[in-house]
């Protein structure tokens, strides 16, 4: 959706294809027994990135979606009944940590400072840089090693925090993206600082309201939206992409195709090329 809006803002004719009957991908919602569930993210950590999409068309995001900052971000309840309210209020955070283990207050401060370094490298410097060349990727290894990316998030937190409960709550961030804190690289520790920097926000009515607002914007800007049809093949003609084929055999011609699925799946399943398919067999 973001790519479609950005391309439309540059005056491209854009067609968005979604295999489900509703938009959103990981941010879509589903309904069951009268209830609405977020299929993916529930909280918003960088609302300015959403606002940017509306700014492209000189429109106010608040006319489409209602995003509110939260005071309490998460509430942890441990097996012994201990409660911990996780927030952006550093005084309250340190006071709660002190009650559990006074020595971990300094460790918490050091952890936040370290995750700031990870954030500056992994988000600020590299989030908009394409990792499409081996040499460029290799250049990042020294910095990533210095930031202890070979450790898991839990291992990184444990370097600073002694108490087991505090270790668990401060290493929970990979869970937000479906990861395991005990195996996910410590680079994901940047989420801890990202939350501190921009806060945690909630879309009133659920994440689906953000998608509804973006869909309304796309329709206003004449982006064609095709729902309920899956792309089965990216058409390759003399080593040039010329369009896509849908599950109803309809072909849509295009000068450029953007796909946000993982590259191995795209190249091995959607593009008919023996050279590409053999490369991605691993």
For the regions a language model picked out, list residue spans one by one.
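Residues forming anionic-ligand binding surfaces in small-molecule and nucleic-acid pockets
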Residues: 184-195
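Rossmann-like flavin
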Residues: 79-184
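Generic, well-ordered alpha-helical scaffold segments in large soluble proteins
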Residues: 10, 156-160, 169-172, 213, ...
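Short beta-strand to alpha-helix junction loop
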Residues: 142-155, 195-216, 226-228
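A conserved short coil-to-beta-strand element within the FAD-binding core of flavoproteins
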Residues: 224-242
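N-terminal glycine-rich phosphate/pyrophosphate-binding loop and immediately adjacent elements
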Residues: 1-117
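Glycine-rich loop(s) and the adjacent beta-strand/alpha-helix scaffold that form part
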Residues: 200, 204-212, 220-221, 234, ...
């Amino acid at each position: 959706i973001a790519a479609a809006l950005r391309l439309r803002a540059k005056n491209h004719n854009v067609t968005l294809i979604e295999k489900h009957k509703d938009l959103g991908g990981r941010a879509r919602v589903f309904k069951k027994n009268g209830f609405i569930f977020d299929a993916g993210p529930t909280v918003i950590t960088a609302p300015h990135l959403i606002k940017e999409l509306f700014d492209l068309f000189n429109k106010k995001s608040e006319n489409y979606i209602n995003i509110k900052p939260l005071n309490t971000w998460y509430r942890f309840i441990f097996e012994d009944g201990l409660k911990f309210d996780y927030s952006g209020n550093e005084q309250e955070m340190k006071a709660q940590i002190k009650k559990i283990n006074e020595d971990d207050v300094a460790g918490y401060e050091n952890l936040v400072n370290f995750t700031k370094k990870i954030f500056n490298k992994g988000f600020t410097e590299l989030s908009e840089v394409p990792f499409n060349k081996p040499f460029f990727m290799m250049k990042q290894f020294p910095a990533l090693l210095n930031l202890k990316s070979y450790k898991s998030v839990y291992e990184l937190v444990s370097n600073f925090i002694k108490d087991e409960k505090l270790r668990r709550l401060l290493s929970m961030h990979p869970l937000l993206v479906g990861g395991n804190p005990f195996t996910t690289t410590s680079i994901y520790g940047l989420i801890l600082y990202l939350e501190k920097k921009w806060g945690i926000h909630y879309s009133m009515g659920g994440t689906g309201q953000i998608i509804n607002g973006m869909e309304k914007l796309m329709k206003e800007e004449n982006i064609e939206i095709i729902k309920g049809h899956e792309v089965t093949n990216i058409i390759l003609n003399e080593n040039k992409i010329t369009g896509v084929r849908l599950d109803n055999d309809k072909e849509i011609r295009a000068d450029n195709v953007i796909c946000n699925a993982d590259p191995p799946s795209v190249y091995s399943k959607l593009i008919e090329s023996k050279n590409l398919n053999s490369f991605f067999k691993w």
